[in-house]
A protein has these predicted regions:
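Glycine-rich phosphate- or other oxyanion-binding loops that anchor nucleotides, phosphorylated ligands
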Residues: 2-132, 140, 144-147, 156-162, ...
Length: 183
């Protein structure tokens, strides 16, 4: 996923294996459970710890710059953040910002699926830009940086696939629906 950095130590071109998200969207209809049974699925740990571990070790083995974990604040696109929003996100300690990690991660959890996100830092968000140290975000820069990292992403995924465990491994993701339905 293409993301913007909210922290100066997370640089353009770095990778982040995301482990949390903040939903700042106004999207509706982001559940598979619209009744008649009420279902509350926990997203306390929304990304798969097994896949995240495989992604992290693979990226490190390839010698690529990676950050272990990070919180992505998902905003309503298509506009980028204002400086005020970006400064707030940064002060909250969140790491990255994008427009697409939600609802995919929540929907995967509702299906008891393992889900991993490898984020590519394509730009610095408006708050860091306001500090004067970096250039403002542009669509051209985002596309250029993501395209430059596409080969690395393909290499990472190809290296991860044979490491993904079979159904005999008891991953916590498989139990996401245990006790979630209220009948």
């Amino acid at each position: 996923t293409a993301v913007g950095s909210l922290q100066p130590d997370i640089k353009v071109g770095d990778l982040v294996v995301t482990d949390q998200f903040i939903d700042r969207t106004r999207r509706g209809g982001t559940t598979f459970f619209n009744g008649p049974v009420v279902t509350h699925v926990s997203t306390a740990d929304p990304y798969c710890p097994v896949l995240n571990g495989i992604a992290l070790s693979t990226i490190r083995q390839l010698g690529l710059p990676v950050h272990d974990g990070g919180t992505c604040v998902v905003i309503e696109g298509p506009r980028f953040s204002t400086k005020a929003e970006s400064n707030w996100f940064t002060r909250m300690g969140w790491h990255t910002v994008n427009m697409t990690q939600y609802p995919e991660v929540a929907l995967a959890r509702e299906q008891a699926m393992c889900y991993c996100n490898i984020s590519v830092i394509t730009d610095y968000d408006a708050g860091l830009v306001a500090e004067g140290a970096v250039e403002p975000v542009s669509n051209e820069a985002v596309i250029k940086t993501f395209a430059a990292n596409l080969k690395n992403l393909v290499t990472i995924i190809e290296a991860m696939i044979p490491q993904i465990p079979g159904p005999d491994v008891d991953c916590s993701c498989f139990h996401a629906l245990d006790g979630a339905a209220i009948e």
